[in-house]
Amino acid sequence: MSKALNGYPNVSEETRERVNEAVKELNFTPNPIASALSSKKAGRVALLIKLNTKTQAVDEINMQYLSGAINRAVEKKLDVITVFFSMIRDWNAEEIEDYFRSQSIEGIIIYGMGMEDMVLHQLIEEKRFKIVVVDVPIVNETTSSIQVDHEQAQYDVARKTVLENGGRSILYISGKLDGYVTQERLAGMQRLAREEKLSLLIKKGDFSEKKARELTFRYARDVDVIVCASDLMAIGAMRALQEMDIFRPVCGFDGITLMGYAGMQMNTVKQDFYRISSKAMDEMGRLLEGGAGRRMVLDHQIIRMQYQDVIS
């Protein structure tokens, strides 16, 4: 019966019609999960996502990721489940594989993977699943990468802010050291400093509003411009400057809605997280159909977010 309902090619048209008539008479509703588990047309896709449990302020990014992937999966008739890093944090590669196989998972879209996530690196290297990594520059036969050009984007927003406001010294508040995007954005800042002959002071902010605030209190008086590797840190820096009663141009990175409520307009890199995730699901569909892994780079925008831009 399940083979007839799920469109298997080796079921005759006569049998399929009889099953459909019985379904109507019995008012039977197929279980979509069971259908996905029994169907061999396409495997299920896991969305593996790392939540920031220390703050709720950046939940918008993960929600946009989930919305983009799930809506596109519905359009492509792919079944998806959401798995959080915290669920598999202490598992080895074999345990993760067993879990995903038990869920009929054939593809994984990974969000927030760091350089130190060695078990995930092992899964990628051993090609156990079709994988799309977001913001990670790793590609092999079964793995694709999708992201904006973080080095160029960081260069663009910082250069625009420096040229608009002048100044020869920059405090750069970076993200987490094990993050691939952190290294790429840092490279963009170092290139800008070389080209424009700027003094560059680099401090690790871990994408934390609180740490950015503390670093601003400590170093802002000695620099001309503050460049932050995330909007959340830019907001922390701006609030600290207001309390210090001094002005320094600040720019961020991401384009989250919260920037519209910051009180001061700041340049930022606008990433379309919904589109990135939707494209990641498209790429997963291509991999599941036998395509080879590849690197995909999407465009970015430099914008100034205003309150009017974020209210509905």
Give names to the regions the model predicted.
Residues 73-85, 172, 189-211:
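Short beta-strand elements in bilobed, periplasmic/extracellular small-molecule ligand-binding domains
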Residues 115-116, 178, 185, 232-234:
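Alpha-helix capping/helix-boundary segments
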Residues 157-196, 292-311:
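An alpha-beta-alpha
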Residues 2-43, 312:
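N-terminal helix-turn-helix DNA-binding module of bacterial transcription factors
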